[in-house]
Amino acid sequence: MDKKNMQSIIWKKNLKTGEAENYLKRSWSAPLVRRGHPHRDTIKIHPNSTLLMIGDSITDCGRISPAVEIVRDSLGYGYVKLIHNQIRATCPKKHIRMINRGIAGNTIRHLAMRWQSDVLDLKPDWLSILIGINDVWPKFDVCQPDEWFVSIDEYASTLEHLIRTTRSQVKGMVLMTPYCIESNRDDPMRAMMDRYGDVVRQLAGQYQTILVDTQAAFDFVLTEVRPTALSLDRVHLKPAGHMILAQAFLKAVEYDS
């Protein structure tokens, strides 16, 4: 039996036994293990750098306030923590420090309001931004007021302003596209999210930042798995979804260990 058919059978079995997330974790972790290759210990982020990751609930993931981070983990339980663990375990000599400044419910408007205190005042060497999901979601969630919706023009102009304000003060910047865990590209929410993602792609090219195309990463997996294996509401991620985000980020910053 060839490898592809074997994986298909394993996937179907995992769906029945509720182990889809474990399967995805194993399959997406595998590329980081290069048996027989020398340990190269490389990553685009410079040694002794501070990497700040800012965004909404996808970044937040239960992080606690800086006031008590000395006694408890302040990176949350999502993709930020996974990235931290991978770098710490395999590139310890790099001494890369990570800061999580995600806040659940945030839009680009909220980021702009707290940019000085949560980004500029902290003087990070590297900055990663994942924002846009909550800007779109109010259009499709009856529980959210219409005024929470952020138009694509406001989203684009505000994000560009933040990039222009910050790029000269950091060594590197990473832009992550918003996403929708939906394989049907004609779905209204997916289609709108793609347009906001296009804004991020355009700005990443214009300002020569690193781009993490999260939607492309999810789309690759969605050819083999159901959306519910990654998220129940097409936004908030199960552990396997966070693993995909972490892998996409590490690939974009040329992580190799």
What is the predicted role of each segment?
Residues 100:
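A polyanion-binding, active-site-adjacent surface
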